[in-house]
Design a protein with these regions (language model features):
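Short, low-complexity N-terminal intrinsically disordered segments enriched in polar/charged residues
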Residues: 1-35, 39
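Hydrophobic alpha-helical core bundles mediating ligand binding, dimerization, or RNAP-core interactions
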Residues: 18-21, 25, 37, 41, ...
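Detector for glycine-centered tight turns/loop "hinges" at secondary-structure junctions
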Residues: 47-49, 105, 122
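Hydrophobic/aromatic beta-strand elements that line small-molecule binding cavities or substrate pockets
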Residues: 79-85, 97-100, 112-118
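Beta-strand residues in well-ordered beta-sheet regions across diverse protein folds
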Residues: 94-95, 127
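Short, cysteine-centered beta-strand-loop-beta hairpins and adjacent loop/turn segments enriched
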Residues: 100-108
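Short beta-strand edge/turn micro-motifs at domain boundaries
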Residues: 108-134
């Protein structure tokens, strides 16, 4: 386990990135969302490892995301857990849970995930997400 001081420093680095990621996601603002990522960017979900370059995340990509979320009645998501489990000066592992909500405030689903943030090109960004969401 990392020391309390290391975890506190990692939280100062990671939480603003995760907050910005969720804000961009909820707005379906592709540019804001991408600004929180490092590329290539990876997502492991439903047994499939997805790999995206910056150029892969375009209007067609966000349209697919919007359609998929609309199909489940999604309106917004919130973080319900963010715990630093491992950290260094170049990488942070964050055990997360997020909850998806409908417009009326009812829960669509809650999913556990692991987010890996890396320090590249002078900034922290999300490099990998491993999620139990579909």
């Amino acid at each position: 386990m990392p020391s309390e001081e290391a975890v506190a420093q990692a939280r100062e680095r990671a939480i603003p990135v995760l907050d910005a990621w969720m804000t961009g996601f909820n707005a379906l603002d592709l540019q804001a969302w991408k600004a929180t990522m490092h590329f290539p960017h990876f997502r492991l979900a439903s047994g499939i490892m997805h790999r995206w370059e910056d150029a892969d995340m375009d209007d067609t990509f966000i349209a697919r995301v919007r359609t998929g979320l609309g199909n489940i009645g999604w309106h917004y998501s919130v973080w319900t857990r963010r715990e630093i489990v491992h950290c260094s000066d170049e990488k942070i592992h964050v055990d997360t849970q997020f909850t998806r909500y409908r417009e009326d405030g009812s829960v669509v689903a809650a999913h556990d995930s692991l987010y890996v943030l890396t320090y590249e090109d002078g900034r922290w960004g999300i490099k990998l997400r491993s999620s139990f969401a579909r």
